[in-house]
């Protein structure tokens, strides 16, 4: 199974990939990776036809553990799929790190 880090994912041309957010819909509405589509992990098998086969599909969940099963399902159906290491939490850590760096550089302590 292929994997990708959040840093690698964010460097890709978003028009050439599909990011599948497999977290529950309520978690997705609170925030997700830019451009991600919401298909909860329990629905991937029945809804995978919504995903374009001509683009690689990168799958995330909260931590990058539960999404592994969805990657295997997609691969078995002929998709070029990979798991996003660390899931949505890795995205949040990256964004927080960027904010702290900005805050430390600018001295701006206001949110």
Where are the regions a protein language model picked out?
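Short, surface-exposed ligand- or partner-binding patches at beta-edge/loop junctions that are enriched
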Residues: 60-61
């Amino acid at each position: 199974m292929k994997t990708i880090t959040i840093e690698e994912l964010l460097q890709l041309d978003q028009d050439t990939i599909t990011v599948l957010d497999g977290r529950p819909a309520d978690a997705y509405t609170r925030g997700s990776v830019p451009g991600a589509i919401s298909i909860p992990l329990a629905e991937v098998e029945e809804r995978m036809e919504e995903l374009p086969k001509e683009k690689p599909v990168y799958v995330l969940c909260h931590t990058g553990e539960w999404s592994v099963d969805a990657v295997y399902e997609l691969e078995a159906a002929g998709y070029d799929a990979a798991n996003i290491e660390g899931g949505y939490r890795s995205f949040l850590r990256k964004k927080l790190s960027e904010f702290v760096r900005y805050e430390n550089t600018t001295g701006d302590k206001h949110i």
